Amino acid sequence: MGDNYSTYLLDIEGTVCPISFVKETLSPYFTKKVPQLVQQDTRDSPVSNILSQFHIDDKEQLQAHILELVAKDVKDPILKQLQGYIWAQGYESGQIKAPVYADAIDFIKRKKRVFIYSSGSVKAQKLLFGYVQDPNAPAHDSLDLNSYIDGYFDINTSGKKTETQSYANILRDIGAKASEVLFLSDNPLELDAAAGVGIATGLASRPGNAPVPDGQKYQVYKDFETL
């Protein structure tokens, strides 16, 4: 069925990598770093410009606010910038590697036009795909898939993933017709929003993903080998 499309738009969490990666690896790494980051912040620190955008002067209140956003899974663009900054340190130091599914790695490598759309910042997306755990090599080895990806979109570039206009924005930016694009995600609200502009959709059904009510109304993909 994948041969019917020239362009693929992929979600990340629960689609190309386990949904547990964010909850069990990325989020704990971030929250562990927040107290030190906030308390040691100065006007000259690299992260000062990001923290100042929260407009909270008291450091204890700022720290509590950031951790609350994480706990409530708020898709805040400033939080996403801050997470990208901290995760960069983890990826570059070798402490974090992305467990992208082997079939997703193969899919990204063999398809001509692949784009990524995630609520995580574009910077965080590039880091994730730049430090992918190589499934065929020792644990310390990683793959860089960025050269195979044609573009990245987030809530700052395109809008919220549950809004139809966001997908219209992406179609405009990639210069594609809706009929040429297949969007894959584990979130039915995102699939419905994309379908609103005529984009074909596929529900990613990966281990650990939450059950989807009325899942039978979607084309379901347990892996990407058939695409």
From Swiss-Prot:
It is found in: Cytoplasm; Nucleus. Mg(2+) binds at residues 11, 13, 186. GO terms for molecular function: acireductone synthase activity; magnesium ion binding. Its main location: cytoplasm. Pathway: Amino-acid biosynthesis; L-methionine biosynthesis via salvage pathway; L-methionine from S-methyl-5-thio-alpha-D-ribose 1-phosphate: step 3/6; Amino-acid biosynthesis; L-methionine biosynthesis via salvage pathway; L-methionine from S-methyl-5-thio-alpha-D-ribose 1-phosphate: step 4/6. Its EC number is 3.1.3.77. It catalyses: 5-methylsulfanyl-2,3-dioxopentyl phosphate + H2O = 1,2-dihydroxy-5-(methylsulfanyl)pent-1-en-3-one + phosphate. The keyword Metal-binding applies. It is an enzyme of class 3 (hydrolase). GO terms for cellular component: cytoplasm; nucleus. Its cofactor is Mg(2+). One of its GO terms (biological process) is L-methionine salvage from methylthioadenosine. Binds 1 Mg(2+) ion per subunit. Keywords: Amino-acid biosynthesis, Cytoplasm, Hydrolase, Magnesium, Metal-binding, Methionine biosynthesis, Nucleus. Substrate binds at residues 118-119, 161. Belongs to the HAD-like hydrolase superfamily. MasA/MtnC family. Bifunctional enzyme that catalyzes the enolization of 2,3-diketo-5-methylthiopentyl-1-phosphate (DK-MTP-1-P) into the intermediate 2-hydroxy-3-keto-5-methylthiopentenyl-1-phosphate (HK-MTPenyl-1-P), which is then dephosphorylated to form the acireductone 1,2-dihydroxy-3-keto-5-methylthiopentene (DHK-MTPene). Monomer. This is Enolase-phosphatase E1. It comes from Saccharomyces cerevisiae (strain JAY291).
